[in-house]
Regions:
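N-terminal, post-signal peptide beta-strand-biased segments of exported outer-membrane/organellar beta-barrel
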Residues: 8, 18-136, 150
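N-terminal hydrophobic or amphipathic segments with adjacent small-residue motifs
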Residues: 4, 16-17, 270
Length: 304
């Protein structure tokens, strides 16, 4: 006999995994306040160059140079899903549907440090290379509701057998049979994600002459993430708003037997080399920095 709860949980985990990895890791590039004034920083000769143009920092004056930055960021992300069975959600019978998430990062710290001596420049940079905050979807995700909608479709296919327990709604077209008389569905859902990718880079630049300098360094990244979400109170809705909880079909003695909850931590780290070059002549300055791909292996730990 198939365990319905295990099937639902597997579907939810698959859906959340797709959601978590679809966008990949987005590298943050606003690692200095100067970026907010002008985004073209790749040829700058200043302390922010520790991140944007490390080779060019070698042309700064001898001594210690330090920049400390604190920023705040917020964002609203909207995901649209047009799954046809969403029309059977009695709380919101519409499709396409928009799922809105709000992200807020009160403090995004970073610092750049350089010590220049003669032709050498020794540098360090700390930042949030990726992530930096939390995002909440108060009504869950479309991928979550798709699982519930498919369960609703299963309930409609069983309507001839369930009608004695839960009378069908004569005003609903049954998606399984194409005839009038079916069930809607209802549920509660929530999703929250948190990502922090801490980056620390160290390296040295060497001024070959008054026009040319080169840089070599390494960046280490430590990742810590958490994803929490749930789908609860799944029920079929029949005539006059009557409900049949899914839990009565899974384990009638446990009202939470059909609830699905996900709470997963991810941690990992990686290292990557960085190289750079800067050439200046007169009023012109040309520079390039290449940061190799960072290979990271994230370890998953399911809390529940």
């Amino acid at each position: 006999m198939i365990n319905l709860k295990n099937v639902c949980l597997a579907a939810l985990l698959s859906a959340s995994a797709v959601t978590a990895t679809a966008g990949g890791l987005l590298t943050n590039t606003n690692q200095n306040i100067a970026f907010n004034r002008m985004m073209s920083r790749e040829a700058s000769i200043g302390i922010d160059g520790v991140y944007y143009n490390p080779a060019g920092v070698a042309f700064m004056k001898d001594g210690h140079h330090l920049s400390i930055n604190l920023q705040t960021a917020w964002q609203t992300r909207t995901i649209e899903n047009d799954y046809a069975l969403f029309n059977y959600n009695v709380k919101n019978p519409t499709t396409p549907r928009k799922f809105e998430g709000k992200a807020f990062a009160p403090v995004i710290p970073s610092f750049q440090y350089a010590y220049n001596k003669n032709r050498w420049s020794f540098q360090a940079n700390f930042d949030l290379a990726g992530g930096g905050g939390k995002c909440k979807f108060d009504n869950g995700l479309g991928s979550f509701e798709k699982v519930v909608a498919n369960i609703g479709f299963l309930g409609n296919s069983l309507a001839p057998y369930l009608n004695g327990i839960l009378p069908v709604n004569p005003n609903i077209a049954n998606p399984a049979t194409g005839t009038m008389g079916g069930y809607g569905y209802t549920y509660d859902s929530f999703m929250r994600g948190r990502q922090y990718y801490y980056g620390l880079s160290v390296g040295a630049a060497y001024r070959i002459n008054d026009h040319l300098s080169v840089f070599g360094g390494v960046r280490g990244i430590y990742a810590t993430c958490n994803y929490y979400g749930y789908v609860k109170n799944i029920a079929f809705v029949g005539n006059n708003g009557a409900k049949l909880p899914l839990s009565t079909m899974v384990d009638r003695n446990d009202p939470e037997s059909s609830d699905i909850e996900l709470n997963t931590d991810q941690t990992g780290y990686g290292f990557t080399p960085i190289i750079g070059i800067d050439y200046k002549t007169g009023r012109w300055n040309f520079s390039a920095k290449y940061e190799f791909k960072t290979r990271m292996r994230l370890k998953n730990k399911a809390v529940n």
